[in-house]
Amino acid sequence: MYAIIKTGGKQYRVTEGQMLKVEKLAQDVGQSVKFDDVLMVAAGDELHIGTPSVKDAAVTAEVVDQGRQAKIEIIKFKRRKHHMKRQGHRQDFTAVKITEIALGKAKKEVKTDGA
């Protein structure tokens, strides 16, 4: 079983037990986070595609780590002028472990009168 979730402006294909680095989340280490924006769920032969998201589907994960990526160095220069500008950037991330992919019942029983 796998799902495609959307968080931080990006889409991720996740399975249960998978470790994943996503854009920074506000939760602390050890807390649980629930991703409700599930775009697709595949369970065996069944395939549920959302328009734009699957109803009653959720992916639960546990926050494992908060950190920063490796530094990316940016160098801008103008040729023949000995003009250079150096800059670095480190993106914040949250490492999560996917604990559960839940696909709720979208169909609800409707009670009708026997009249």
Curated annotation (Swiss-Prot):
GO molecular function, one term: rRNA binding
GO CC annotations, alphabetized: cytoplasm; ribonucleoprotein complex; ribosome
Pfam families, sorted: Ribosomal_L21p
InterPro entries listed in its UniProt record: bL21-like, bL21-like_sf, Ribosomal_bL21, Ribosomal_bL21_CS
Keywords for this protein: Ribonucleoprotein, Ribosomal protein, RNA-binding, rRNA-binding
GO BP: translation
Its job: This protein binds to 23S rRNA in the presence of protein L20.
Stated family: Belongs to the bacterial ribosomal protein bL21 family.
NCBIfam families reported in the protein's UniProt record: L21
HAMAP family: Ribosomal_bL21 (MF_01363)
UniProt subunit comment: Part of the 50S ribosomal subunit. Contacts protein L20.
Name of the protein: Large ribosomal subunit protein bL21
Name of the gene encoding the protein in the UniProt record: rplU
